[in-house]
């Protein structure tokens, strides 16, 4: 069985009190800020002609992705490579899961290969927590169902931090399918922990009413209300299968009510735009908004590598400590 977080925390090399990154609920504001500070240092490394450092040489990182991913998987692999870690990737199609192997068996086989860090994306909420209980490897959650996506939220707040003086004075609106969004949940956890004010906006069928009280946010079904006094608007990708489930009538109607346009930018001259990607152009955001100078979407992508370098740097075991 895995060592408990409390005992493992004593051995953390750089001050975090956690062995894993499963979700952000146990992380305090100072721990989040520490990860952001570390990521900012690696952001500067990525601007150098030589972008690789030997920090995790000899450390092994396995990416287990049981859902499709492009940006997150590539970002984690690049981050591990920039730190000189040994990397191996496994997808559902190439794993023995297709032959009936359980997640627990997969974890034990990975551990038997002496893998230090497992980056896991899985369609089942709680899968990373399960893995953390049955292996001694460090587990990093790369997205589990609609539950959590902690590194996405951390790279988002890292991106925001470059444009604000204080999170305590920051107003962020998250717009879209909140109910089914792990990105929204993790961003709410990070932002409220740091002291920001968060508004959730979307169709009534996509707004979980329990989040307003449980997570100290406000909700609205009106885009204008969400953008009033807002500093940063984060649009979420609409999953087209939700239309088939009757959660919104059509993409045209969704865009009419919740799509952000150039007109919104004209009416809110200081508003910054974010999106975790991939963007459905013409639905969540118009082309003009995606490509606008106040869109910081590409900064999110760049910061993703730096943030994941920071997470690996802080949580991965050092070979000299083994």
UniProtKB/Swiss-Prot annotation:
Gene Ontology molecular function terms on file: amino acid binding; aspartate carbamoyltransferase activity
Alphabetically ordered keywords of this record: Pyrimidine biosynthesis, Transferase
UniProt: L-aspartate binding residues: 99, 182, 237
GO biological process: 'de novo' pyrimidine nucleobase biosynthetic process; 'de novo' UMP biosynthetic process; amino acid metabolic process
Annotated pathway: Pyrimidine metabolism; UMP biosynthesis via de novo pathway; (S)-dihydroorotate from bicarbonate: step 2/3
Single GO cellular component term: cytosol
Binding site for carbamoyl phosphate: 71-72, 121, 149, 152, 277-278
Catalytic activity reported: carbamoyl phosphate + L-aspartate = N-carbamoyl-L-aspartate + phosphate + H(+)
Transferase listed as a keyword: yes
Enzyme class of the recorded protein, top EC level: transferase
SUPFAM superfamilies xrefs: Aspartate/ornithine carbamoyltransferase (SSF53671)
Keyword Heme: no
E.C. number(s) listed in UniProt: 2.1.3.2
Family statement: Belongs to the aspartate/ornithine carbamoyltransferase superfamily. ATCase family.
Subunit record text: Heterododecamer (2C3:3R2) of six catalytic PyrB chains organized as two trimers (C3), and six regulatory PyrI chains organized as three dimers (R2).
Biological role: Catalyzes the condensation of carbamoyl phosphate and aspartate to form carbamoyl aspartate and inorganic phosphate, the committed step in the de novo pyrimidine nucleotide biosynthesis pathway.
NCBIfam families per record: asp_carb_tr (TIGR00670), PRK00856.1 (NF002032)
Protein name (record): Aspartate carbamoyltransferase catalytic subunit
Lineage start: Bacteria, Pseudomonadati, Rhodothermota, Rhodothermia, Rhodothermales
């Amino acid at each position: 069985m895995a060592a408990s977080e409390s005992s493992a925390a004593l051995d953390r090399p750089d001050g975090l009190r956690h062995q894993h990154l499963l979700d952000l609920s146990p992380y305090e504001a100072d721990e989040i800020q520490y990860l952001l500070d570390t990521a900012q240092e690696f952001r500067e490394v990525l601007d150098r002609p030589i972008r690789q450092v030997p920090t995790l040489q000899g450390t092994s990182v396995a990416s287990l992705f049981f859902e499709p991913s492009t940006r997150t998987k590539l970002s984690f692999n690049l981050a591990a490579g920039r730190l000189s870690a040994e990397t191996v990737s496994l997808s559902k199609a190439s794993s023995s899961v297709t032959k009936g192997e359980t997640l627990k068996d997969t974890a034990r086989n990975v551990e038997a290969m002496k893998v230090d860090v497992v980056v896991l994306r899985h369609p089942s909420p709680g899968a990373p927590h399960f893995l953390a209980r049955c292996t001694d490897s460090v587990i990093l959650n790369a997205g589990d169902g609609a539950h959590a996506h902690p590194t996405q939220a951390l790279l988002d707040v890292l991106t925001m931090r470059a444009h604000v003086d204080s999170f305590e004075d920051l107003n962020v609106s998250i717009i879209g399918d909140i109910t089914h969004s792990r990105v929204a949940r993790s961003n709410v956890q990070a932002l409220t922990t740091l002291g920001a004010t968060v508004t959730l906006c979307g169709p009534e069928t996509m707004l979980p009413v329990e989040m307003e009280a449980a997570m100290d946010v406000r909700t609205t079904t009106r885009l204008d209300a969400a953008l009033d006094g807002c500093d940063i608007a984060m649009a979420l990708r609409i999953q087209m299968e939700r239309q088939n489930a009757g959660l919104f009538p059509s993409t045209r109607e969704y865009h009419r009510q919740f799509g952000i346009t150039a007109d919104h930018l004209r009416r809110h001259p200081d508003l910054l735009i974010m999106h975790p990607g991939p963007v459905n152009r013409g639905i969540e955001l118009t082309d003009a908004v995606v490509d606008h100078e106040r869109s910081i979407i590409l900064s999110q992508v760049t910061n993703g590598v730096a943030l994941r370098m920071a997470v690996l740097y802080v949580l991965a075991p050092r070979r000299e400590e083994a």
